[in-house]
Amino acid sequence: MIIGTLISLAVTRTKPADIGKAFFDGMGSAYGSIIGIIIAAGVFVSGLTATGLVKAFIGAMLNNPAIVKICASVGPFLLGFLTGSGDAATFAFNEAVTPHAQEFGMSIVQMGSMATLGGTLGRTISPIAGATIICAGFAGVNPVEITKRNGIPIVLALLVGTFFLAQG
């Protein structure tokens, strides 16, 4: 980002003060969005916990250990797809479920990696994700068209990634 800023300064011959202001405005805006997502994920987890959904989810996984490795990646994947935010999905899952990984016979790193993969891939094909909306605008298509086009490869990536991460 800094290199790009310096190159744009040299090419456009803009005042350094104007470039600096734009650079730090952009950084602050991006940083604020990230903090907002993290806070929203924490509030979301609190809501899920308050409604008993987290306890029910953990109970279902404890009663059926065969689904744990699938839920560790598919749960955040679906959450990322529905919310358009892979970070919110991953933070929510890792805050609520991953601390219990050893109860499911997995390491925290293994379950956390599976959740990260799932959340990231879910956001990637979400028609309401910011990146999808921007790309659709550039291409002049509906965001759902991008989701349709990328759906099969992303689901295959989820399955392959889950398979390898589940091996431990």
Question: Where do the protein language model's features map onto the residues?
Answer:
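Juxtamembrane and boundary regions of transmembrane helices in multi-pass small-molecule transporters
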Residues: 124-168
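Structural signature of hydrophobic alpha-helical transmembrane segments
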Residues: 1-3, 56-66, 116-126
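Juxtamembrane helix-boundary/capping and inter-helix hinge elements in multi-pass membrane proteins
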Residues: 15-16, 29, 105-109, 135-145
